[in-house]
């Protein structure tokens, strides 16, 4: 809904900040919603920036609930939710995802500022007291806080919420602050180690971004996923949506899908002779970042090759 945010997290992949401007007015957002309904996705996530910064947020939320009959998720930092508005928000909502980035006041405040942790935890307890239980709390993981994952999971267990662990992505404001999250030994591949400790978790499949999911930015431009909002990967603008676009997407008859195929490690020249390339870095957004950063590529390659060769052989 917006690229404005009242917080300024140093990892933000879309560089949201309070001084950003909203690009779509209320009528344009409603038109976008009408076109999303035509696409008929299973789930619609309302996000930002911080969506509650929009003065017309509740008008838009009401319109979404009226028009869209699938699962509606609100993604928010929860700092602007007033207790008096909770009933209105949770009515007909499928889930709320709240970014928290910590298991206590100190760990949270390092990213989100003082007082956010207590405010969010109290709000979560209040929402749950209303009988709404489908709440997820998210944490972006980097070298500074990887040891906090167990404590974060324990917090979620105590609250009865779902932990959402997100990998740090070296894009947006995160690109400016990558040294705080990455180093030679703990690069963007390190967090994947837990996924590769069992052969059964290995996969050679690329994700289905652009087909199973799409991301719409604050201008209405549509991309394969939130981490691939680059000009060369723009699919179309939601305000200009036509039914024929769906046929083009499902037939993969768009230039963006050719570029997508080039984000497979098996198609990268320096990866072609690697014996574990089909299992390495199957996330297109990670590959996109690695291709354009030689130092990060080499660091990730060394780390992942060591992990994968150990597991496979």
Features from the language model and the residues they span:
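Short, small/polar residue-rich loop motifs at catalytic or cofactor-binding pockets
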Residues: 207-211
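N-terminal pre-triad scaffold of radical SAM enzymes
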Residues: 1-11, 41-46, 52, 213-216, ...
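Canonical Radical SAM [4Fe-4S] cluster-binding loop centered on the CxxxCxxC motif
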Residues: 1-27
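Secreted/processed peptides and extracellular or luminal domains of membrane proteins
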Residues: 11, 15-18, 174, 183, ...
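C-terminal accessory region of radical SAM enzymes
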Residues: 130-132, 170-202, 227-281
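Radical SAM/AdoMet-radical enzyme domain recognition
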Residues: 23-50, 54-167
